[in-house]
């Protein structure tokens, strides 16, 4: 498995060598990356990146001035990440990726409960051609904590109360069971994945092996992501 991962990373590194390329050539080469990495290979890239982060050995790729200029002509991310808005979950750092590598959708409780977020997800897959979607929940999620607590009712401004109520729909079996927070966070991740699977167009891509959807659980304490099937 390690040989496979190394091979994938070498291929990615070779493909991302754009010195001397025009903007059009750069765009073509980035598209070429998407065409040559399948969903499982992209997942291995993210797993390896997370190992770098956990062991404080981030490579910090694609963060220089050249990369910034390369991305002006268009974006070609390799994966879509649905994550919580929590400032303690720095998605690109967690997976050791740089500018233009990931299409990130961040909402409270990593929730996909409106047209804006689902539309963003569909855009990433249908127009940017990302082949992997990972929905990442995290340890001690404040949104899910509030959603399963019965002590927050009536104490928050209207907008926050509406947000909590929306999140509560995704963790209904755990309302009033604050001691089950981790279980609720995992359950919520699965509920968001189920929403994705209800989209027939995305489901067709999954069935054809052109798109992979998985869950993740991020540990605040050590930076590790548990990849959930």
Task: Name these PLM-found stretches.
Residues 83-89, 108-111, 138-139:
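Short glycine-enriched loops at secondary-structure junctions
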Residues 1-4:
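Positively charged n-region of N-terminal signal peptides that target proteins for export
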Residues 22-76, 99, 110-128, 142-229:
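Divalent-metal-activated hydrolytic enzyme cores
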Residues 80-82, 103:
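Conserved beta-strand elements of the Class I
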Residues 18-20:
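C-terminal motif of bacterial Sec signal peptides marking the signal peptidase cleavage site
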Residues 88-105:
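Catalytic core of membrane glycerolipid acyltransferases/transacylases, capturing the structured
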Residues 135:
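Conserved functional hotspot residues or short segments at active or partner-binding sites
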């Amino acid at each position: 498995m390690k040989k496979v991962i190394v091979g994938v990373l070498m291929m990615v590194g070779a493909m991302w060598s754009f010195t001397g390329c025009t903007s059009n050539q750069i765009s073509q080469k980035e598209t070429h990356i998407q065409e040559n990495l399948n969903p499982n290979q992209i997942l291995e890239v993210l797993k390896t990146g997370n190992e770098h982060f956990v062991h404080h050995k981030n490579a910090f790729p694609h963060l220089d001035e050249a990369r910034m200029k390369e991305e002006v002509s268009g974006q070609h991310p390799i994966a879509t990440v649905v994550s919580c808005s929590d400032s303690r979950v720095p998605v690109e750092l967690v997976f050791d990726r740089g500018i233009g590598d990931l299409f990130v959708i961040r909402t409270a409780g990593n929730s996909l409960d409106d047209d804006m977020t689902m539309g963003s997800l569909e855009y990433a897959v249908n127009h940017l051609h990302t082949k992997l979607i990972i929905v990442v929940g995290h340890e001690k999620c404040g949104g899910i904590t509030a959603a399963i607590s019965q002590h927050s009712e009536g104490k928050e401004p209207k907008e926050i109360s509406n947000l909590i109520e929306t999140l509560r729909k995704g963790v209904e079996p755990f309302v009033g069971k604050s001691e089950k927070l981790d279980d609720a966070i995992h359950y919520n991740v699965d509920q968001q994945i189920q929403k994705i699977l209800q989209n027939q167009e995305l489901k067709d891509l999954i069935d054809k092996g052109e798109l992979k959807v998985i869950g993740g659980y991020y540990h605040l304490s050590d930076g590790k992501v548990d990849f959930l099937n």
